[in-house]
Regions:
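Glycine-rich ATP phosphate-binding loop
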Residues: 156-178
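Conserved short submotifs of the Hanks-type protein kinase catalytic core
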Residues: 213-227, 231
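Catalytic-loop of the protein kinase fold
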Residues: 257-273
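Conserved catalytic-loop aspartate of Hanks-type protein kinases
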Residues: 321
């Protein structure tokens, strides 16, 4: 992804010729088909198929490391069926049931559509309407990576150029490598699916996903001024700007609360700054659209940002996001310092859970903001934390009074 491939290379990107192991493989004729959706998960495929006879073709991991093509069909209002595309190693032709074979997958699909022959006699599934790819699904050839911003266990983040024919746009691209586990890929797609729903000026916007081949990519708006944490550490941030960051974060998190999103990882490191230095909530890798999340363990989570009930009972709710927002505000006024300075994670947990300890807000924090954090966000009883809407309203009123 480091540079745009030439035409010859581009036409071969992700192409695999017909294999000899009875699997239908991705070839250029199917990659160009309107109904080919790449590595869209089964859940997303079923959500896209609305009416009886709607269908699409997608890639799926049949067994670890073995990727095949599948046909997904809406059979009834309640039921979708999924069929493997098979390749006869003797005839080198494709089929669903061996009684009829075609030289190409598009020819096989067309035959079933025109003859109205069910994909299988047992299912009775007929192909009526091909489900076209959403504009949200972006071709890999439209993306040119420029600079790596960071890397993770299964992928990297790049600044890239997106060109879909309407002009070039600078974007951020989060990738998922081919060697990632199936669970990691499903979480990756879940993150993209969640972010796609959110449209707010203080939440990072997802433009689309590239999932026709590896690496899988989430394409997002680019925030050139980097993370809030880095900005706080590197610059002497004025009091007015700190208050604005606090207000913008509250606005974005209140929107997520209204959207039933539990973020679970609100922190200065996960807030990005736009060209105009506006704060945007990012990183939805731990998020979910629900009212409560119960975890089995808290091994790899940032403990110093957790609410007491999360530390004790491994529960996340919209109220735990409010607690974490309070820690974010502390970070803003502490110039990006780590919360609970001088304490280990174990000591932090003990002081909060056993001793009901609360940090003192940093010097320079307006008393109105300090009162909201210590008196509302950090209430031991989650119900006394009110709502992010109510908290944002109070902060906004104070911010407006200072203009």
């Amino acid at each position: 992804m480091a540079a745009r491939k030439n035409k010859k290379e581009g036409s071969q990107m992700g192409t695999v010729e017909k294999s000899s192991n009875n699997d239908a493989s991705v070839t250029d004729d199917i990659r160009g088909a309107e109904y080919y959706h790449g590595m869209v998960p089964r859940q997303d495929a079923e959500a896209n198929l609305k009416r009886e006879g709607d269908f699409l073709v997608r890639k799926t991991e049949q067994t670890p490391g073995k990727v095949v093509l599948a046909l997904s069909v809406r059979v009834t209002d309640e039921l979708c069926r999924h069929f493997m595309l098979n390749l006869d190693p003797t005839s080198n032709k494709f089929y669903f049931e061996a009684t009829h074979q075609e030289s190409t997958i598009p020819d096989l699909i067309t035959w079933h559509m025109t003859t109205k022959t069910p994909v299988s006699a047992a299912s009775g599934a007929k192909l009526r309407r091909p489900m076209e790819r959403s504009p949200w699904l972006i071709n890999h050839d439209s993306i040119v990576a420029n600079k790596k911003l960071g890397e993770g266990a299964f992928g990297d983040v790049f600044v890239a150029e997106l060109d879909q024919g309407g002009g070039k746009q600078e974007v951020a691209v989060k990738t998922m490598r081919a060697e990632a586990t199936r669970d990691a890929r499903l979480k990756f797609m879940k993150e993209a699916r969640l972010m796609r729903k959110y449209q707010h000026k203080h939440v990072v916007k997802v433009i689309g996903v590239a999932i026709h081949e590896h690496p899988l990519m989430i394409v997002m708006e680019f925030c050139p001024n980097g993370s809030l944490l880095s900005h706080l550490k590197k610059n002497k941030v004025a009091a007015g700007e700190k208050l604005r960051f606090t207000t913008e974060a509250a606005d974005g998190i209140a929107y997520l609360e209204r959207s039933k999103c539990i973020h679970r990882d609100i922190a200065a490191r996960n807030c990005l700054l736009s060209q105009k230095n506006e704060l945007k909530i990012s990183d939805f890798g731990m998020s979910d659209s629900t009212d409560e999340i119960k975890e089995e363990k808290l091994d790899k989570v940032p403990l110093k940002w957790l609410a007491p009930e999360t530390m004790q009972d491994k529960i996340y709710t919209h109220k735990t996001d409010i607690w974490t927002f309070g820690v974010l505000v502390w970070e803003i006024y502490a110039d990006g310092s780590e919360p609970y300075p001088g304490l280990t994670k174990v000591q932090t947990r003990a002081k909060i859970v056993v001793n009901d300890y609360r940090m003192k807000m940093p010097d320079g924090t307006p008393s109105q903001i300090a009162d909201i954090v210590t008196g509302t966000c950090w209430q031991k009883n989650p119900e006394k934390r009110t709502t992010m809407d109510a908290i944002h309203k109070k902060i906004r009123e104070f911010y407006d009074s200072k203009k």
